[in-house]
Amino acid sequence: MPDTITNKLQNSTVQDVIATKLARAVFAGFEAMFATFLNITLGAQSRFEQRQYHEVQSAMRERLQVYERQVKSVSEAVKVIAYAELSCPQTWQLAKNIYGNMVKNHENEPIAHTFFNSTFGAIWDDKKIRTVHLFVLKAKYRTQPRPYDSLVKRISLQHGFNSAIKTLITNQVFRVPFSNLNQDVATLQATLTQGAKQQCRQVYELINLNDGYIEYAYSHFYRNKACYLIGRCIAKNGDNMPFAIAILNTPKGLKIDAVMMGADQLSLLFGFARTYFMVDTDQPARYVDYLSVLMPHKQRFELFNAIGFIKHAKTEFYRYKVDTTKNSPASFKYVAAPGTPGMVMLVFTIAGSDHVYKVIKDKFSAPKTATKAQVKEKYNFVKQADRVGRLVDTHEFRYLAFDLSRFSEQLLQQMKEHIGSSLIISGKALILKHVYVERKMTPLNLYINDCDSKALAQVMLDYGRAIKDLAGANIFPGDMLMKNFGVTRWGRVVFYDYDEICPLTDCNFREVPQTQNALEELSSDSYFDIEPNDIFPSQFKVFFSANELAFNAFNSHHSDLFNAQFWQTCQQQVQQGYLPDVYPYKQSWRFK
């Protein structure tokens, strides 16, 4: 063996040696990143048990910084290691091949690939990147689903469904006891039985026959104030009903608050407007494989994103984008997205896609006065915030490539006119230097055009709730026009226009001063001083000026939003550290 190593060293070139060191440095950085990420995650249960909800938010913000911080650290180390070879494409291609062999069969090989891509991109400033230097599109870089048996435990129903449910709950290890375990188990058993009866007849029949089994994931899913137990009820023929059990830690002890059943209900929990979960696992890709079984309509990038691996989610999304575009009819073209054209963003989409692409315009329409840098800061603010189910998550891409032939002539003309500085056309490719990707929704101002009175009342109720949920999370949307809100397939209202978003506590909410005389009232100029952060809630009514029915429906539930006192009270609560309860499931699903 020593002779073999000696021979290899003697036969190595400088390029071989440097490429090997580059690969080792990136791999060491990846391992350090993953360890730090996991260490923060490991504290989730303790924070839940101690009801340290402010620390929960701090830990989430800290974890969001880990990846970029480690990429920066590795990039600096690599510059020292490589120096003369830093800009040599051949050295990097060799380093990629060596790195690929190093992480081959590694438990987290796909995420390790993404970390290499990120490091290379940080050093090469993205624009010089070629796919030969990246782990992206080739089939060998796409891992196939792997067994997840080591992640789950199964409980037989042979002793009865109620007994199995009690075993399921008592198998969970917490420092805090349940305040009323027997009542929780009885309610959970009855709710799951009824859910199976409605959603999966085969599972329901086997529950009654004490046949089949319950399967659950060993690792809990922590987010905000709750812990979620994920699993499914399975019949022997393979029919199954996924579930997610929400556990809260109340002053009296632990309490089962709700259970979500079926893939559709679980999708609400894993929605794109929610904060990321903390899941105690060193096998995230296998957890994504398992979650894909429970929610087969969810894409892999959505699930990686949900458990906090947001950079790898971008890699998975890019693959998804390329595949779906390639497999769609050639007649499907990128076009301007439905809705009112943005003053700050050019937004486009393609038929069959669930996403929109948003590019910051070169010049903003009046009265917008922000800069590109300020808009980017707003989007970063949202990334760090607790989105409380009311802010759409975004993926930020640099130098994202598209097939030029898939763009409509009309959209191409708009792009050249409004985002020319962000646009590169090279051969058959259209490349965007900077772009945000968001989930596509129906703009609220368009949604209400097709509503009957019942649907209008419901969506206006949720519109106000969305604004109040954001206020409770110390977030003020800024521009609250209906065109800046979207409606999900569940009829839930979320906000997606971030160029004026800010912390609620940065605002100065005021009532409009009374005029002193008729001249002031008739004057076209303001008769009182206004500071840049002054907000006048009484003027929010103008948002409904074109739709009296919508205003009446909104006002019947949320007239308090037009008063400065409401907002001032919210600010006081935020400053006092109050964190409102926001549930990622319907109130009707909560246990009584």
Swiss-Prot record:
Signal peptide: none annotated. It catalyses: L-seryl-[isocitrate dehydrogenase] + ATP = O-phospho-L-seryl-[isocitrate dehydrogenase] + ADP + H(+). GO terms for cellular component: cytoplasm. One of its GO terms (molecular function) is [isocitrate dehydrogenase (NADP+)] kinase activity. Keywords: ATP-binding, Cytoplasm, Glyoxylate bypass, Hydrolase, Kinase, Nucleotide-binding, Protein phosphatase, Serine/threonine-protein kinase, Transferase, Tricarboxylic acid cycle. The active site is at D393. InterPro entries: AceK_kinase, AceK_regulatory, Isocitrate_DH_AceK. It comes from the Bacteria. Its EC number is 2.7.11.5, 3.1.3.-. GO terms for biological process: glucose metabolic process; glyoxylate cycle; tricarboxylic acid cycle. The keyword Repeat does not apply. ATP binds at A337, P338, G339, T340, P341, G342, M343, K358. It is found in: Cytoplasm. HAMAP family: AceK. PANTHER family: ISOCITRATE DEHYDROGENASE KINASE_PHOSPHATASE, PTHR39559. Belongs to the AceK family. Bifunctional enzyme which can phosphorylate or dephosphorylate isocitrate dehydrogenase (IDH) on a specific serine residue. This is a regulatory mechanism which enables bacteria to bypass the Krebs cycle via the glyoxylate shunt in response to the source of carbon. When bacteria are grown on glucose, IDH is fully active and unphosphorylated, but when grown on acetate or ethanol, the activity of IDH declines drastically concomitant with its phosphorylation. This is Isocitrate dehydrogenase kinase/phosphatase 1. It comes from Pseudoalteromonas translucida (strain TAC 125).
